[in-house]
Amino acid sequence: WSSDVCSSDLTKNEEDCEMTVLSEQDKIRLLADIVKIQTENNHEIEVCEYLKDLLSQYDIDSKIVKVNDSRANLVAEIGSGAPVLAISGHMDVVDAGDHDDWTFPPFELTDKDGKLFGRGTTDMKGGLMAMVIAMIELKQSNALKQGTIRLLATSGEETEQYGAQLLADEGYLDDVSGLIIGEPTSNIAYYAHKGSMSCVVTAKGKAAHSSMPHLGTNAVDILVDFVNEMKQEYKNIKEHDKVHELDAVPMIEKHLHRKIGEEESHIYSGFVMLNSVFNGGKQVNSVPHKATAKYNVRTVPEYDSTFVKDLFEKVIRHVGEDYLTVDIPSSHDPVASDRDNPLIQNITRIAPNYVHEDIVVSALIGTTDASSFLGTNENNVDFAVFGPGESIMAHQVDEFIRKDMYLSYIDVYKDVFKAYLEK
């Protein structure tokens, strides 16, 4: 690797130049190397092995924490002592779909017109590699005078966050003061995000011939009653859901390029519940003996997972607990921190010097690995989601990250990590 290049257009002062270890070409090549590794909801262990070898070249120790034979996390540290800043990105990517739909091969990094094309460039191998390079350059320049940076590269974020949950269960977050998730954020700094739950309600009746329906119990009718009552419960909640700990309006207004009204703001910042799937019956001349309804619920601190579980059980008791059950296959908590916590303060102060625009501060309507890392953040860990890339490019055909944004965020991260730990 090159270690003697300091690009003048990226360097802000002499200290920055001293912290630059890798050339721009090297930084792009490193991203290309991990884009090449096809981690479509599997095989993250190959990225772990690549990063472990890379970090070892710069005397940075790391550990592979296996989920199974093909899926794993990587943990690496530089510095020592408190405070501990955890930095995290996931190694899995979503399916690339039909490769013929892509202008360029999805698992070969293509550098064209100032854009780096490839699956995962934005979501989120670009952010992950920017963090890794920032660690390397801080280590090589001996710029870190206080505290510890702990890299947590995770598996399975796009599915059930089991990589992050494993690291949390094994104590890798127990001593952290701050956490940065490097998801693509379009130059928005997120101080909090919503949670997400999947709930499946099943109605079980009794089959009978449609000519003799009185001999059966119609599961569809029972489930329709449940859905209608839950709809009324949700309406009642939204009528009172007027004060929000999470303010997602700045994010939405930036993306939509317009102001939004009060009704919209209640949706974006508040509790959201959607009945997205309804299935019942097998054939037209039979009384259906089974029906299912699936809900996606976006939770907030005021209406968390415990509230949702209690709500579903309450409606089931009222409609018919002899016929209805609820299963919750996935549940990720909302995560909140102070809007002006030290990480957010450093990001909003430092990043504009590199990205040449003010940083909007907002809550995020999606979820991240922080749900598994921090839960509801009862320990009040300083928290930020901030990373290179436009969030609208995530999961898209011809996914790309702007080259200048990827390179700039390496410098942003170096300065933010250092400033946070020193103060």
Regions found by a protein language model. Name each.
Residues 84-150, 397, 403-404, 408:
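Active-site metal-coordination/substrate-binding segment of hydrolases
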Residues 1-7:
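Short, small-residue-biased leader/transition segments that mark boundaries at the very start
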Residues 76-80, 203, 375-378:
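Active-site beta-strand termini and strand-to-loop segments that position acidic
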Residues 150-152, 200, 217-233, 397-423:
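Structural helix-boundary/capping segments
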Residues 124-198, 257, 264-265:
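Acidic/histidine-rich catalytic neighborhood of metal-dependent amide-processing enzymes
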Residues 170-318:
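Midchain, well-structured core segments that form catalytic/ion-binding scaffolds
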Residues 18-97, 290-294, 308-309, 403-407:
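N-terminal helical capping/dimerization or prosegment-like subdomains
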Residues 63, 238-269, 323-423:
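An extended, acidic, His-containing surface patch that forms the Zn2+-binding/catalytic region
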